[in-house]
Amino acid sequence: MASLDLSVKAKSYLHKLCVEIPSRRVGSEGNQAATDFFAGLVASFGFGTECPAFDCIDWSQHGVTLAVDTASFEAFASPYSLGCRVRAPLAVASTAEELEAMAVSHAVLLLRGGLTKEQLMPKNFPFYNPDSHKRIIQLLETKGPRAIIAATSRDVEMVGGAVYPFPLFEDGDFDIPSVYMTEEEGNRLVTHAGQPMALEIRAERIPSQGWNVIARKGAHPERRVVLFAHIDARMGSPGASDNASGTIVLLLLAELLADYRGALGIEIVAVNGEDYFSNPGEQLYLSANAGRFDEVVLGINIDDVGYHRGKVAYSLYDCPVGVADTIRRTCSAHKLLVEGEPWYQGDHGLFIMNQRPALAITSELLAELMGGITHSPKDRPEIVDATKLAMLALALRDLLLRLDEGAA
């Protein structure tokens, strides 16, 4: 299939995943529609498919009211927060040491300063959780304030660092209702410390389900290449580059492999949950493949690959010399592919942690994306170049066929 034809299909898939489906957040109807669309399409290309499911929550919110006497304050519900209606005195803490010395079970607690300099990792996040974050969460749950207000500034290290204010909590396992506000609003509010205040969070957690989509071909699945792209999107973001782009590359690749009859196993996985607080799809895949990662010849992760600026960058992790040579030789034939810097925040970490060779593919300008576009409303279809998605699908097809020749 010609690159031009693939580009046209890529544009139509982009419209489907980002416009016709308004949200792909885990647990939403849009997320379920996206995985159903992916599963049906890859099955039509002759792949055997399965869709292992997991329980999760969707979330709905209808705003926040926060007032002290006649003064009102702008605040936003923390993603996945429980709702509440509270009237209680305002307490304030700026450090863990201050919090440890306080009794706040009767109060609404305003967090500011050092306690809110960076977003706290979800309490049950399995792959990374620093002790400093765990200490803050443990203190909050022990002290048990009736609700929490977080005054945050800018976290330049956070993905989507241009978002201001940022939510201190994004955690459906943390059950103290919470909101967040700007540093300036926090400075206004702190002058009312000790006074009674009213807070209403109109929000609801909704039990739901999501699922991964796993598509397989090849005579020998016990020796296979696994290709990941996470299909979910961050709440509030169209998720065009992150990661409709990677999902579309897998769909184009599946069509290019419609007639594949090789020995090497090929496993295409639309992983569901990379942008969700507990990574349920990743955890489900790890559990299902426990003791079987030795079968993986190469793990490939495709994320944020379609940005219209710059080229597409690849990086290698613990690849045998022969596999690395094949990757570099294949990529060198495509002018929009360049070898880039290593990065470890994506789903290729599942292969690395299981000591398997990995290939990560993303934008050459990933830092630019993460600094102001990724996880934000700016991640729209207009920033994605469909020709890059077509090129990458063709390059991956060539790579898989060469790896199959080596396996035969």
Question: Where on the chain are the PLM-derived regions?
Answer:
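Extracellular/luminal Protease-associated
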Residues: 75-170, 175
